[in-house]
Amino acid sequence: MAFGRSILVFAVVLWTILFGPATWALAPSYDIAVRDLFPLADWQKQFRITDGKDRGKLVPLSLHHAGGAQETWRLDFGDYAGIHLKNDVNGSLMMDRLDLTKSHSFIVYEPALPIFARDVRSGLGVARQANFKMYDLETGRLKRVGRVTHMMKRVSRSRFETPAGLIDGYYFEIDHRMDMQYAQLHMSLGLGCRLDDGPVYGAGRYTLTKLGFFTETKTAAAGLVSR
C-alpha cells in the first residue's frame, strides 16, 4: 500500500533521524512541556533519506505558520507529505490533516488527533482516537475511511550518539495504528528531542495486515544534513 510507506517516511522525518542509536538512558524526568521539545517557529532544515526506496536523496523539512489563527502550523517534507498542526485550548499539539503527495491522497482526522499532550506526564499511556477519511488529492474522491489510535507509551531522558556528537535529550516510544476495512496499518516510532531545539533522533517501521493474515513490513529513515 503506497500510502503506508508515505506515512512512515513522513512520520520518521517529522521526528528527524540523526542516524545513530540512543546509547544511554538517564534518570527519568517528566516536568517538561511539549513546546520545550517541539518549538513552534518558522524554520527549514535539510535531510538525507538513509533507508528505504529513496535512500540517499536530499529533502527539505520545513515548519511555517499556516496563516489564520496564530496556533496553526504546517510541516512539509519536500514533495512527500505535509502535516497540518494546531494547539488546542489545553496546549496539546493536534494533527487535523495529513497530505500524502506521493500517493496523491490526503487524510482528514475527525476530530483533530492529539499527538502530544501539553506536558509529558499527562500523555503517557493514554490512547487517543479519531476517525479519519482519505481522499484523492486531485479529485476529492473519498478513497478510504477508518479509525486511528495513537499512544505515547514511554519516555526517558537519553543520550544519543549522532554524527554531530553526543546529544542529551528525551526519547519517546510511540504506537500508531490505523484500522480500515479489510486492512490494518501499525506503526512503531521512536522519537528523540533536544530541549529548545526540537527533534534530533527518530526511527520507525510499519506493518500492513490485509484480510487478517497477509502482512508486509517496511522501515524508513532520514538524517539531518544542515539547518
Regions found by a protein language model. Give the residues of each.
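Mid-length scaffold segments of soluble, non-membrane domains
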Residues: F116-V145
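Bacterial N-terminal signal peptides that target proteins for export
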Residues: M1-F10
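Short alpha-helix capping/helix-loop boundary micro-motifs
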Residues: P111-P114
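Acidic, serine/threonine-rich low-complexity disordered tracts
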Residues: W24-G91, M95-L100, F106-I107, Y135-R227
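Bacterial N-terminal signal peptides
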Residues: V9-F19
